[in-house]
């Protein structure tokens, strides 16, 4: 479940407004509070779609900043390739967000703006474009979409062939 959470949070790129090329290629100002996001390792997930899927990071230049009020903002560029490991069918997605995380005890409220990759065994794997609000319980692992506006692509259906 931790791998799923790590990729969901990473999917906060969440998430698609990429930084301008100049700012994305520059190192963050050490006084800005921005910290580079470390991608999780590429991994195969067997409990999301009716077939195993491999999620690979193609490009990452994301940064996280936690503000004084505790809200964490993730911005930058994130591109992943998702592959149906049975058929070899794959698709590349820009899921550059941005995203916002607010924590209250064990409950994390995630706001995804732009494009995001969200997945859970309950609803499958989705790439969203628009605003999505979700909650994640860090103790139980429950991930729930509270509201969404915009386009949604069912990645499992896309890769089913």
Give the positions of each predicted feature:
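Bacterial N-terminal signal peptides that target proteins for export
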Residues: 1-10
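Beta-strand-enriched cores of mature, soluble protein domains
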Residues: 27-161
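Bacterial N-terminal signal peptides
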Residues: 10-21
């Amino acid at each position: 479940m931790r791998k799923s959470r790590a990729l969901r949070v990473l999917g906060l790129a969440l998430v698609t407004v990429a930084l301008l090329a100049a700012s994305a290629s520059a190192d963050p100002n050490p006084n800005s509070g921005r910290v580079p996001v470390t991608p999780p390792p590429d991994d195969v997930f067997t409990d999301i779609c009716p077939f195993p899927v491999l999620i690979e990071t193609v490009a990452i230049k994301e940064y996280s900043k936690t503000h004084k009020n505790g809200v964490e903002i993730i911005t930058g560029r994130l591109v992943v390739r998702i592959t149906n490991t049975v058929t070899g069918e794959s698709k590349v997605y820009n899921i550059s967000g941005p995203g916002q995380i607010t924590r209250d005890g064990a409950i994390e409220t995630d706001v995804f703006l732009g494009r995001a990759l969200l997945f859970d065994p309950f609803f499958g794997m989705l790439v969203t474009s628009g605003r999505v609000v979700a909650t994640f319980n860090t103790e139980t692992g429950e991930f729930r979409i509270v509201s969404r506006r915009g386009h949604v692509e069912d990645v499992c259906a896309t890769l089913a062939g």
